[in-house]
Amino acid sequence: MPIHPTAIVDPSARIDDTAVIGPFCVIGADVSIGAHTGLKAHVYVEGPTTIGEENIIYPYTTVGVAPQDLKYHGERAETRIGSRNKIREFVTIHRGTTGGGMVTTIGDENLLMAYSHIAHDVHLGSHCVLANGVTLAGHVIIGDWAVIGAFTGIHQFCRIGKHSMVGGYSVITQDVMPFSTTVSKRDNSVFGANSTGLERRGFDPIAIEHLQNALRLLTRAKLNTSQAIERIEAEIPATPEIADLLAFIQSSERGVVK
């Protein structure tokens, strides 16, 4: 277990023998770090926090610190990070709160670029990319394979659907539909299916075409959401992707970006 002599590690921390703790890192009590995970330097981790295997965490990242929530009064909440994530410089990841299940979670194989912020009770899936300066407010849920462009802000309690792409500098205050591409400055607009991303992930071209047609009905046909759903159910084959899209929309509490 290579731990740099300048690192400070609480005796209760559970660190795998193959993990690497770099210079000037601080590892607090009740922290677990899995095999082959590396903390480069100046990384600060508070517990209760679990970090899985083969993660790389870059300098000046903070993990598991208290949330920026005035209702938080020191309750025992935790942070869970999966495996094979790359967490770049100055990323901030906050623990959960009583209002959100007491846990913040990050899945596997994500890339969190510099200065990204993961607030309390966020649930980030797997294979996601958060570009520089992305800010996820409390209770945000990000589906697998989502890509969020630089300096985008996501309002609390919003959901970003799986396989979606959000353009840089966007301000997202409603749910973003799965499989879609959304770009905004202040007024958000959906520009259709995330065709390029779906092709790269091996989706069938016919399935992508059905998604494109469904999103066109939702965003460009001058229909309200209920009318668009009726048209989709009547006119477009009920593929698994279409079922996921409709289930996401029908479960939205904030409305969806159109």
Model region roles, listed by residue range:
Residues 2-187:
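Structural signal for interior beta-strand "rungs" in well-ordered beta-sheet cores
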Residues 1-6, 11-12, 17-18, 54, ...:
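Terminal amphipathic alpha-helical/low-complexity segments used for targeting or macromolecular assembly
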